Structure formats: structure tokens, C-alpha cells
Amino acid sequence: MKGARNIYHHSYMSFLLVFVVMILIHPALSIYINTLSSTESLTISSNKTLVSPGSIFEVGFFRTNSRWYLGMWYKKVSDRTYVWVANRDNPLSNAIGTLKISGNNLVLLDHSNKPVWWTNLTRGNERSPVVAELLANGNFVMRDSSNNDASEYLWQSFDYPTDTLLPEMKLGYNLKTGLNRFLTSWRSSDDPSSGNFSYKLETQSLPEFYLSRENFPMHRSGPWNGIRFSGIPEDQKLSYMVYNFIENNEEVAYTFRMTNNSFYSRLTLISEGYFQRLTWYPSIRIWNRFWSSPVDPQCDTYIMCGPYAYCDVNTSPVCNCIQGFNPRNIQQWDQRVWAGGCIRRTQLSCSGDGFTRMKKMKLPETTMATVDRSIGVKECKKRCISDCNCTAFANADIRNGGSGCVIWTERLEDIRNYATDAIDGQDLYVRLAAADIAKKRNASGKIISLTVGVSVLLLLIMFCLWKRKQKRAKASAISIANTQRNQNLPMNEMVLSSKREFSGEYKFEELELPLIEMETVVKATENFSSCNKLGQGGFGIVYKGRLLDGKEIAVKRLSKTSVQGTDEFMNEVTLIARLQHINLVQVLGCCIEGDEKMLIYEYLENLSLDSYLFGKTRRSKLNWNERFDITNGVARGLLYLHQDSRFRIIHRDLKVSNILLDKNMIPKISDFGMARIFERDETEANTMKVVGTYGYMSPEYAMYGIFSEKSDVFSFGVIVLEIVSGKKNRGFYNLDYENDLLSYVWSRWKEGRALEIVDPVIVDSLSSQPSIFQPQEVLKCIQIGLLCVQELAEHRPAMSSVVWMFGSEATEIPQPKPPGYCVRRSPYELDPSSSWQCDENESWTVNQYTCSVIDAR
């Protein structure tokens, strides 16, 4: 019996040993780790990795060009394919690196234990430990160890893609947070640093993606038509894949998912500038390029043929004028120089115009278009024909026979025609004069006799003359009808009566905002009642209003003696329609009638930041956490203007009265009347007309008219110090004889007494809420504020660095140099040729009236 038991025991142990060995050597049976706790770490030397459930993705370290990176790749794909790189622009210089959780952040440390990458979580619940986890879909997340709710992830790699879009990732905007998720190519095939190409969603009208090289558009995807992007006909429905476009109040994004997990599929922006869909077939073990965009080097090039022309690969030349249009420059057109595009043969007369139907078209660029998804193509045609500025219309969605309405009121650009047997493209209806419609019909009809032809021509001429005589009467009737409709739908239609009243060098066609009838604004504000007055400044008055549907608005009414003249007003109108960010005020429309010029904005319940910082009643309601969040929000909004929007925009009048607060105390930058658009390669500009608010102007701008992104950075620095101290830079005075806030803060900083500048309201609240006040966070804000107001522009950080410094707890922030003290200007006019210098020991006094107001964007 004893021998039998030994044999049994020996057999059992042998079986157990074999089983363990099989687990260790067989990948399918191996047990992988997909989480990293606060007590664990990954190092290059250990060669440890995290592997997702199902063993599809793996996170670890890799080396290329003698540099080390933390990244993610497909585990089962023999050809190593990277889909995400954490420290792409901050590689490790040697084989010493550690990934760990520190201070509720996921941190990558180099050989000297300095962070080179982290998750930028500024605050977390210290009582609840966090873990990093690699999910089955390839999302690398940070979460509370006891909470698996995806909506409450603290951080996730899906929000910060590099060059690859995986299934279930989203590419586009999170409107709640202002986060824009876009792709940036590798520098080269073996260099993962940020390359020259980006693939980013623009949402100004119909959302569409732009492939850009160093922020200059190279290719446009075309708008989403309910099935696919109209400019990517190759992206067809597949049996193993479902893709969708999400557009609601919370997000605008593209995503796809796999219905058959035996295939891997990804969208990648490669370093050569092509956006590709690649699918891995396990049986043949290769990545198959399903499609690549752009396809054609001519017709897929952004605005290849200029305005009012379309590209067709089946014609020679490939560029063709739309029917009813001729080349703008015949000589250049014959030389295959098409950038000038085409012009109308016959100008539109408003009444009597018609449409030509262009089939299988990639719709024109929609940044200047208006969209109404509630109506069909018939109503869309009526709306277009009643708007003298309408140049074309189309369906917004081609499913189920078509629905929705897109109307263009600007020139038509970047159009392409697809082959007659192509499944892509859609109908585009372009507005033509009656004479050009007739030419088309005659060309396609039978040859008629000369007598009949002359008769028809005479009839057409008589008809056109008769129509032209009735043009004013027709326009007046349309205006009355629009007024009636506008009373019911004041924000959904363009109103035409204001067009006749507006005169000046600016054309009505240049406006990109819905026009609101004067009568509607008068009713909304109760005839501009003083009870609805929100604020007043040099530009005029801001009123609160309420539309018939109950929507509250803010109306910025320029006075006839406004310091913001027609130039600034038109600048604001044309600029703000192109901007969309959670930290920018949303414009709803404008009203131009006679001498009246008004902008209509969303109404923000908490008015302007200065009413909280400097007002007696509201000041105590602004605790430190709210001040810190407001500072971060303004920084993100300014970063969007400088870097992340389609245009580089210099605000030039950033101040606390231009920071508005919504009901959730989210800050929104307003007032773009003085803003300027910079080219991507433009670093600074100068002007003889210095505008803005003294106290917020940088020295180089106030004295020499030189402005740049660093001018806005200076203004932001002043705002930061005002938020921390609760004191105005202008008119500041204290017993130590510092006559501006910057001098006061700088002196306290040098003496190591920086916390003395903190608003007493915050200090007084410590007894009831001691946990809210965080001295290190306050000191960091003061230091960043001083960095932003340094005297020399080249010493000031870019807003990208500012946002980075605010978001990191472990970053070593540089020590600031002295600020630019001289921020005021002599009250006397200076000869433009004269020069004057700023003396650090000299004070300037300006007899100039100023009023803090709510100033909508």
C-alpha cells in the first residue's frame, strides 16, 4: 500500500510539473498581468510588460535609433506594429527607465529619476489607491482600484492617440471637456516623435476631417453623409466591421468597432502623409492596406482647382468649371494653373435664378455652410432660393432618400466628381442665373430653326428685363415673409432685411453668422431696457435678452461713438464664427441694420470674472479650487487660439473682464474685436494703432506696437496674478510704494514671501475649509504668472508649456526673470518716429477712464 501511495504521489507531482511547464511555454495557456498597482513598476531591465486580456495588446519598453520609448503594440502580430507611444517627444537616452504610479499619476522616470512623461492628473483621491490597467481593446487606463466604471476613468490612452486609431477609440471632439483627439504621424518609419502630418476633425459646420502638413490643409475627407465621409469612397461597409459618426451636445467624433475579433483593423497616419486602413489577416500574416487617402495626387489635393471648379480624373484637364462659370484667368487655366478657379458668366439676380444638379460629387468645403437637419431637399431648395446669398444646397444625409439641408452662402471650393459607376458622391445643386440655365437646356435639346431661336432669345431677354424691374418688390416681399418666420424661429434662419441697410466696404456675403432681425432683438431686450443692462464700456452696452422660445441671450450693442469701430466689429463677426472650444464664448448671431451693429451671444449666468475677483458681494464665493480651475480653463482656451484651432489667433485684449463664467463656473474667453490671425510661419507683427487695455499689455506692444503670441502670454500672466491676489494690476497701490501689482508680486517672490500676496478672502476661509488651500499649488501659480510677465518676450513660455506646467505636479518650473513693469502709456500723442524707453524706476500715470464690464466675445 505504501508503495502504491508513493507511485500515486509521484505520478501526481509529475503531472503537476508538466502542467506548469506547459503553461509557461505555451502562450495560449500563459497567465499575463494587465494591471500595475502603486507598489509595482515596469523597468527596461526587467523586460516585464503588461498584456491585455485575450493577449491582443502589450505595453512595455522598446528601442529605436538608440532611444527608448514606452509604447503599445500587437502581441500576436509577428511584424512588430506600434499603436501608441507615451513619450514620443521625450525619449529615454539609455536603457534605464521606470514606469510607476506616483502621487496618483502614472509616471515614466529616466536614469536620473526625473519624469519624462506622466498622466497630468493634478488632483486625485489620496484615500483611494489607483491602478493602471491595460484593457482588452487596447485602452491603457488609470482608475480607482475599486471602480471599474468606464465613465469614471481618471485617465485613458484613448484620449491621447498618437498615429493610430484602434477599434472603439474616438477621433474628434469631446465638447464637455474641450478635448480634441487627433492623430499625428511619426517623424519617420523608425522615429516615433511627432511628425509633419496631422489628421484632425473640424466642426464649424458639417464635421469633416482635414489631413494637414504643418497645419496647412492637404486633403479634406468631405463631410459625413450618414454612411461614410464623402471624400473617402473606398471606406465601404464591411461584414466584420461597423463604423459610426457621433454628433450630439457632448461629442462630435468618428469611431468603429469589429464584429469579428479574428481580424485586427486600424487606421494609421503614416509618416509619408497618407491616412490608411490596414487589416491583419492571421492566415497570411500580413497587414493588408484596405485603402489609403489621399488616392489621387491631383483630385484629392485640397482646393486643387480653385473656387467654383471641380476635379474629375476622367477628364483632361482634370479641372473643370461648374456649368455657368468660366476660368478667371484663361491664360493661366490653359497653362494648367488652376488656383484662381472660375467666375460666373452671369451674375445672380436673386429672382428668377435656378439650379444645376451635379451628380456624384464630393461636397464643397463646409466651414462656411449652414446646416438644418430638420428639413428635406424640397424645403432646402425653397430656403436657398429665398436667400439671395445662397450659392448651393445639398442633403446633409443621403440615407433613405436623403434628409437634412446644407446651404452654402460663400464660394464653393474643393469639389470633386466621381466616376459614374462609383458608389460615392451625392447630388449638389448649384445656383445659376436664368440665362445659364437656359444655355444648358438649349445645348442638350435639338437644333431649332433660326427664327424660333431668335424668338426664344427675345422672350428670354424680355423675361429677364421684366424680372429685374420687379427685383426690389420681390426682395421686399421676401423680407416681410422672413420677418414673420423669424418671430417664430429667430435663431434658425438667415434674415435678409438687414442686408439692404448695411453699407460700407464689407460685403454682406462675408458674414458667416445667422443674421437676427432688429425687431427680434428689440423684443428680446424689451426695447433695450435699462433693467436688462449687464454692463457698459467704450464699445457700447451689453444687454440681457430672452427669445420667444425662452432662450436667454446676451446682446452686445455698439454705440455710434464706439471705440470698437466697423473694422473691429467685422473682424469679430468673421473670426468668432470659426472658433469652437469649451473655454470660448459661443456666438449665436449678429444684427446689422442701419447704424446699428450688434452681436448675440450665449448668456452666461455668472457674468465676468472681474465681478468675482473685485466685487464686494461675490468675492467671497470664489474659493481656491475654483480659481485654480478657472486659471487652467483660460490657459486651455488661449492654447486653442494659439495652436489647436485651424487659425493661429492673437487675442490682443485678454483681461479679467473678458473672461466670462457659465453656471458651472467654467471660464470662457470673449471679445475678439481686436484679435488678429497669424500665418503658421509668422512669429510677430507690429501696428501703429495700439489697442487693448493698459495694465494687460506687454511692454513691447504698449511701446512699439509689436504683438505676438507672447503678448497674450503676458496678459495671461497678469490675469493669473490677479486671480491669486484678488487685486487689480491697474490702479494698484500699497504702503510699500509699489505702484503696480507686478512690482509687488516680484518683490515678495524675491524675498521668499510670495504667499503674502494671496487674496485675504482665501486666507480667511482656511478655518472652515483648510483642505482647499494648497500652498504648493498657489506658489506654482505665482511662479507661472511671473514667468508669463517677464520683460522680454523670448523669455516668456508658450501657452503649451504653461498648460503643461499647470497640469503636472512633478515638473521642475524655471525661475522667473524680472517682469515688464512699464505697462502704461503717456496720455499725450507721440510722434510715430519718436522713441522712448521704459525705466524700471519710473512710474507712469494715465488720466484715462476705465470701466470693468461684461464684454461678450
Curated annotation (Swiss-Prot):
One term of GO molecular function: identical protein binding
Annotated family: Belongs to the protein kinase superfamily. Ser/Thr protein kinase family.
Residue ranges of the TM segments: 447-466
Full protein name: Putative serine/threonine-protein kinase receptor
Segments on the Extracellular face: 33-446
GO process annotations (BP): rejection of self pollen
Gene name for this UniProt entry: SRK6
Signal peptide start-end: 1-32
Binding, ATP: 534-542, 556
One cellular component (GO) term of this entry: membrane
Boundaries of every Bulb-type lectin domain copy: 35-155
PROSITE patterns membership: BULB_LECTIN (PS50927), PAN (PS50948), PROTEIN_KINASE_ATP (PS00107), PROTEIN_KINASE_DOM (PS50011), PROTEIN_KINASE_ST (PS00108)
Glycosylation sites: 47, 120, 196, 260, 389, 442
Function: Involved in sporophytic self-incompatibility system (the inability of flowering plants to achieve self-fertilization), probably acting in combination with S-locus-specific glycoproteins. Interaction with a ligand in the extracellular domain triggers the protein kinase activity of the cytoplasmic domain.
Key word ATP-binding present: yes
EC number: 2.7.11.1
Reactions catalysed: L-seryl-[protein] + ATP = O-phospho-L-seryl-[protein] + ADP + H(+); L-threonyl-[protein] + ATP = O-phospho-L-threonyl-[protein] + ADP + H(+)
Keywords: ATP-binding, Disulfide bond, Glycoprotein, Kinase, Membrane, Nucleotide-binding, Receptor, Self-incompatibility, Serine/threonine-protein kinase, Signal, Transferase, Transmembrane, Transmembrane helix
Species of provenance: Brassica oleracea var. viridis (Flowering kale)
Location of the Protein kinase domain: 528-779
Principal location listed in the UniProt entry: membrane
Annotated active site: 653
Start and end residues of each PAN domain: 350-433
EC main group: transferase
SUPFAM superfamilies reported for this sequence: alpha-D-mannose-specific plant lectins, Protein kinase-like (PK-like)
